[in-house]
Amino acid sequence: MRSAVRGKTIRVVKGTVIVKEGTTDTCAYQIARGRVNVYTERKGRRYLLTRLGPGQFFGELNLISDAARSASVQAEEDCVLRVITRPVFNRLLHRSPKSVVPLIKVLFERLRTMNLKYLLALES
């Protein structure tokens, strides 16, 4: 994703909600600096799903899907984020497929993790 991460860079301050669950947009983010919390809210309670840091991606499903965001993401500290838009992703996918392999690996790893959690939930 080296080419993609040269795109737009944004700075967000601690506490900023970067992605809101239920919204739809068509970009993903790579964390250049800082940490974020990924969470969901159910019946007025917030559930922390994971924490992400430098080099990690979030929002990647919306590069290929028009579905609503499945979680919210909030800056745990001041962050610098690289924005990957759907047009940039599509251009890279066609011109330089190898450059999107790291992001595709993230997608498959998260799918594998969700499958394992689902199987464990079925067994309990």
Predicted regions and their residues:
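Cytosolic regulatory regions built on CNB/CRP/Popeye-like sensor folds
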Residues: 1-124
